[in-house]
C-alpha cells in the first residue's frame, strides 16, 4: 500500500508538487497485512512477552502460525489469534506485491521446503532502475541470486490474485453495492 500511495502522490496534480521530492527508487515489500501495534502488544502480553523481547518473527509457509523468536526461545502463535490484530485497512488493500515499486521483495516461500528457503527472499524487478540496482548488488557480491521455480511464481500469482479478490469483496460489502465503486 505504501508503494501505491507513493505512485498516486507522484502522479497527482497537487499545487506546488513538482514530483522532484520523491525517491528515485522504490523498494516495496510483499505484504498480506500489517498489525495494529496496540492489539499486537496486547497479544504479546497474553504470552508474557513485550516487543523488546522479540529478536525476530516469521510466518512459515503452510504452518498457519506466527513464529516469535526471543532470547528465551521460539513461541508459536496460531494465526487465528493474530487475525484480530490485523489493521482494518489491510482488509481492503489489493496490492500484496508492491506492484508500483521498482523492486518488490518478500519471503514468499512457495513451492519448496520452507526450512530450505529460510533466509531467502523473492525479488520481482519491475523497472530498469530496479534491474540496475540488482545487477550492481550482484556485481559487488552483496546479493546472491537463484531462480525461483515456476511453481513458486504460480503460487505467488495465485496468492496475489486471492488477496485482490478478498479485498474487492470487502470493499463491495462495505459500500453495500458494486455500483458504488
Predicted segment positions?
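Iron-sulfur-associated redox domains of electron-transfer enzymes in respiratory
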Residues: 2-181
Amino acid at each position: 500500500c505504501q508503494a501505491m500511495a507513493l505512485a498516486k502522490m507522484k502522479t497527482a496534480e497537487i499545487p506546488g508538487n513538482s514530483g522532484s521530492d520523491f525517491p528515485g527508487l522504490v523498494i516495496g515489500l510483499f505484504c498480506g497485512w500489517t498489525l495494529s501495534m496496540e492489539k499486537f502488544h496486547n497479544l504479546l502480553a497474553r504470552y508474557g512477552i513485550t516487543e523488546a523481547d522479540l529478536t525476530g518473527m516469521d510466518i512459515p509457509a503452510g504452518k498457519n502460525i506466527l513464529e516469535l523468536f526471543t532470547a528465551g526461545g521460539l513461541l508459536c502463535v496460531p494465526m487465528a489469534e493474530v487475525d484480530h490484530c490485523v489493521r482494518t485497512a489491510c482488509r481492503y488493500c489489493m496490492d500484496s506485491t508492491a506492484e508500483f515499486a521498482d523492486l518488490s521483495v518478500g519471503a514468499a516461500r512457495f513451492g519448496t521446503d520452507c526450512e530450505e528457503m529460510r533466509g531467502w527472499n523473492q525479488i520481482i524487478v519491475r523497472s530498469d532502475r530496479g534491474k540496475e540496482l540488482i545487477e550492481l548488488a550482484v556485481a559487488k557480491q552483496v546479493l546472491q541470486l537463484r531462480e525461483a521455480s515456476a511453481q513458486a511464481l504460480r503460487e505467488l500469482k495465485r496468492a496475489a490474485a486471492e488477496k485482490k479478490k478478498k479485498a474487492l469483496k470487502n470493499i463491495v460489502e462495505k459500500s453495500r453495492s458494486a455500483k458504488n465503486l
